[in-house]
């Protein structure tokens, strides 16, 4: 099985790259985020590879990091999620944002993925919520905030600050993670304006 490929970028397709490894061109399917991050044709690149072997074909999927590949595998443990949907999810949400979305039970963020409806998004969140801590360094403050939001126990300044960041164009998982970190740093009595300021500082790191 192929686990990693290192070579020169030959060309790009809609959802794949041709990687020239010592004169052999490998067609490797990637998320749109991975494709956008790869260099121009003729330049060197390294991809972690997941190899799928079927009766009628061998298909390669490529990732910039082993971590992204682990998420690709994990997503496919969810009912109705195959390789195509898993790549689409990773095209919409990078691993850290996906982890935060799942920790925050943010089905809407996952459902923004083309081809993923509310039911599949709900399955992804519900089936993976207990597996996220083992795979990602999710801030414990995010997990705590998730429970508070679920039970409507989150302080008003916190919810207002999250809404403000979302209105500024940040995704819900990003905004919630930033405000969770801000609230942890500022304390329980922090005002909305202070949380927004600290949250923006977190997002700029």
Swiss-Prot record:
**Which segments carry the region annotation Domain III?**
154-205
Q: Describe the protein's quaternary organization and the partners it interacts with.
A: Homotetramer. Forms an RuvA(8)-RuvB(12)-Holliday junction (HJ) complex. HJ DNA is sandwiched between 2 RuvA tetramers; dsDNA enters through RuvA and exits via RuvB. An RuvB hexamer assembles on each DNA strand where it exits the tetramer. Each RuvB hexamer is contacted by two RuvA subunits (via domain III) on 2 adjacent RuvB subunits; this complex drives branch migration. In the full resolvosome a probable DNA-RuvA(4)-RuvB(12)-RuvC(2) complex forms which resolves the HJ.
- Region described as Flexible linker: 144-154
What Gene Ontology terms describe where this protein resides (cellular component)?
Answer: cytoplasm; Holliday junction helicase complex; Holliday junction resolvase complex
Q: Where is this region: Domain II?
A: 65-143
Q: Which GO terms describe its molecular function?
A: ATP binding; four-way junction DNA binding; four-way junction helicase activity
Similarity section: Belongs to the RuvA family.
Q: Which Pfam families match?
A: HHH_5 (PF14520), RuvA_C (PF07499), RuvA_N (PF01330)
Swiss-Prot/TrEMBL keywords: Cytoplasm, DNA damage, DNA recombination, DNA repair, DNA-binding
| Segments for region (Domain I) | 1-64
Q: What is this protein called?
A: Holliday junction branch migration complex subunit RuvA
UniProt entry tagged with the keyword DNA damage: yes
Locations listed in the record: Cytoplasm
- Entry note about domains: Has three domains with a flexible linker between the domains II and III and assumes an 'L' shape. Domain III is highly mobile and contacts RuvB.
Its GO biological process annotations read: DNA recombination; DNA repair
What is the role of this chain? The RuvA-RuvB-RuvC complex processes Holliday junction (HJ) DNA during genetic recombination and DNA repair, while the RuvA-RuvB complex plays an important role in the rescue of blocked DNA replication forks via replication fork reversal (RFR). RuvA specifically binds to HJ cruciform DNA, conferring on it an open structure. The RuvB hexamer acts as an ATP-dependent pump, pulling dsDNA into and through the RuvAB complex. HJ branch migration allows RuvC to scan DNA until it finds its consensus sequence, where it cleaves and resolves the cruciform DNA.
Predominant subcellular localization, coarse grouping: cytoplasm
Q: Which InterPro entries match?
A: DNA_helicase_Holl-junc_RuvA_I, NA-bd_OB-fold, RuvA, RuvA_2-like, RuvA_C, RuvA_C_sf
């Amino acid at each position: 099985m192929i686990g990693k490929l290192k070579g020169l970028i030959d060309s790009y397709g809609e959802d794949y790259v041709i990687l020239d490894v010592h004169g052999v061109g490998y067609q490797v399917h990637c998320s749109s985020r991975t494709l956008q991050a790869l260099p121009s044709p003729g330049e060197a690149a390294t991809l972690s590879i997941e190899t799928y072997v079927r009766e009628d074909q061998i298909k390669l999927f490529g990732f910039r990091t082993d971590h992204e590949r682990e998420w690709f595998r994990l997503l496919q443990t969810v009912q109705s999620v195959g390789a195509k949907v898993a790549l689409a999810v990773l095209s919409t949400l990078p691993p850290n944002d996906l982890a935060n979305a799942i920790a925050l039970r943010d089905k809407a963020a996952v459902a923004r993925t083309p081809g993923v409806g509310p039911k599949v998004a709900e399955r992804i969140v519900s089936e993976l919520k207990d597996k996220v801590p083992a795979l990602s360094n999710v801030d414990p403050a995010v997990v705590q905030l998730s429970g508070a939001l679920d039970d409507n126990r989150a302080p008003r300044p916190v919810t207002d600050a999250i809404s403000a960041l979302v209105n500024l164009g940040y995704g819900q998982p990003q905004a919630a993670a930033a405000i969770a970190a801000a609230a942890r740093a500022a304390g329980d009595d922090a005002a909305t304006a202070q949380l927004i300021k600290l949250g923006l500082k977190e997002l700029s790191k």
